[in-house]
């Protein structure tokens, strides 16, 4: 969870907080490489929540451009990563959504680390969408109301999440000192380990990343047992 771009810019003395977003965007490619270096084969980057879409039009336009640039960078042939979009692209301007889809399509056959780009994403909405899709399929198959109710099970819902077919996250990292999930992968992170740091995202270093990995490796995961 790449948080703290604006606060970093203000505390660094920049009058234009957009500088924080730009520096933070450059950090994403670095972080993906760090993950690849320690054999992490799947990472999800929370770039824009549904709530973020309520920000000013000026800031949103900047964010849209930056996010599209991130997608373009990840889609470069030398990265060999596989981009997957999770969220509501229909909430984005068409040109931005188009660039994101092109990045996803261009990397579909790559063999490197998988990178989920969470854009226009909301954890609650993801669950709602999954249940609605499950019920719609059941309705189309002619299931009765009782059968539809019976069809709503944990595994069935998981099958229709944006991240269907992927494992749940082992570790969630959030920068900037905020200690909450803010809607991030609410279903999938039920038993994820969570690591918080006061460091703002633009200042997040490889050593910080490795500390998170080391801390995670020393935890005993019981999955509620």
Curated annotation (Swiss-Prot):
GO cellular component: plasma membrane
Superkingdom assignment: Bacteria
Keyword DNA-binding recorded: no
Cofactor stoichiometry and binding remark: Binds 2 magnesium ions per subunit.
Keyword flag Magnesium: yes
Enzyme class at the top of the EC tree: transferase
Record: residues binding Mg(2+): 3, 193
Active site location: 3, 52
Quaternary organization: Homodimer.
The family this protein is said to belong to: Belongs to the UPP synthase family.
Protein name per the record: Isoprenyl transferase 1
Organism per entry: Corynebacterium glutamicum (strain ATCC 13032 / DSM 20300 / JCM 1318 / BCRC 11384 / CCUG 27702 / LMG 3730 / NBRC 12168 / NCIMB 10025 / NRRL B-2784 / 534)
């Amino acid at each position: 969870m790449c948080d703290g771009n604006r606060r970093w810019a203000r505390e660094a003395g920049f009058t234009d907080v957009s500088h924080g977003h730009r520096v933070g965007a450059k950090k994403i490619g670095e972080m993906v490489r760090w993950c690849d270096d320690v054999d992490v084969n799947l990472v999800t980057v929370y770039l824009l929540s549904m709530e973020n879409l309520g920000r000013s039009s000026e800031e949103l336009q900047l964010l849209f451009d930056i996010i599209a640039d991130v997608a373009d960078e990840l889609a470069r042939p030398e990265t060999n990563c596989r981009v997957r979009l999770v969220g509501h692209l229909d909430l984005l301007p068409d040109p931005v959504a188009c660039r994101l889809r092109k990045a996803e399509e261009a990397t579909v056959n790559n063999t490197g680390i998988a990178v989920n780009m969470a854009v226009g994403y909301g954890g609650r909405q993801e669950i709602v969408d999954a249940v609605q899709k499950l019920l719609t399929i059941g309705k189309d198959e002619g299931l009765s109301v009782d059968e539809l109710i019976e069809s709503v099970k944990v595994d069935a819902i998981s099958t229709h999440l944006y991240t269907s077919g992927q494992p749940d996250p082992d570790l969630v990292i959030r920068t900037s000192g905020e200690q909450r999930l803010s809607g991030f992968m609410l279903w999938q992170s039920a038993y994820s380990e969570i690591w918080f740091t006061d460091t703002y995202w633009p200042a997040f270093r490889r050593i910080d990343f490795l500390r998170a990995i080391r801390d995670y490796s020393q935890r005993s995961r019981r999955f509620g047992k």
